């Protein structure tokens, strides 16, 4: 009788949960101050007007308004928040 006693355990078989990164508020959406606009690793997108950046590179609204994405120098992408007073003009 062939027996298989002690098989070694696999070195694989584990994974970490996804980090839920990405755009949380898209262009044209209304935001209030403090709303997270983008969660990212590194500065894929840079903060524009009325947008702050956290220590983990999260971009968030500093004022109430409407989200706008645009590109700038060196091919960088920027996100700004246009206040509702600016949008009305």
From Swiss-Prot:
Segments traversing the membrane: none
GO biological process: translation
InterPro entries from the UniProt entry: Ribosomal_bL27, Ribosomal_bL27_CS
GO cellular component, as recorded: cytosolic large ribosomal subunit
Record flagged with keyword Repressor: no
NCBIfam families: L27
Protein name: Large ribosomal subunit protein bL27
């Amino acid at each position: 009788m062939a027996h298989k006693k002690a098989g070694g355990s696999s070195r694989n078989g584990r994974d970490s949960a996804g980090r839920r990164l990405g755009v949380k508020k898209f262009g044209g959406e209304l935001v209030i101050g403090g709303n997270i606009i983008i969660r990212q690793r590194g500065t894929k997108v840079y903060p524009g007007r009325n947008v702050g950046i956290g220590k983990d590179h999260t971009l968030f609204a500093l004022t109430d308004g409407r989200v706008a994405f645009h590109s700038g120098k060196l091919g960088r992408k920027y996100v700004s928040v246009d206040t509702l007073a600016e949008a009305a003009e």
